UniProtKB/Swiss-Prot annotation:
InterPro entries: PFN (IPR048278), PFN_euk (IPR005455), PFN_sf (IPR036140), Profilin_CS (IPR027310). GO terms for molecular function: actin monomer binding. Belongs to the profilin family. It is found in: Cytoplasm, Cytoskeleton. CDD domains: PROF. Coiled coil: none annotated. PROSITE patterns: PROFILIN. This is Profilin-7. Pfam families: Profilin.
Amino acid sequence: MSWQAYVDEHLMCEIEGHHLASAAILGHDGTVWAQSADFPQFKPEEITGIMKDFDEPGHLAPTGMFVATAKYMVIQGEPGAVIRGKKGAGGITIKKTGQALVVGIYDEPMTPGQCNMVVERLGDYLMKQGL
């Protein structure tokens, strides 16, 4: 299966009548492996900050997490594995695997729990595949 198929079929899938606003699979260096049409472009320093938060959980909490200049308040995630952010009625979930970052961005009416489930399920699957 291509990386684009993972994004199209597993991240942008419909959940209870809703779907993510955008999603992507990125390398740890920020290289885009596959993305949905409306996925924002991360700046290099944003990827650096995200990777540092995986290595040093809590790094982003004081300043927030920036994604394509949009600021997300970092909320409880899983240290070293998942970063979650909130911005208004929407948010973001980033799951780190051995080689990739699985990213989902949502807006209402999708819920944070639905976004977490979609992103983390694919991330867990990729980790089981050694990715």
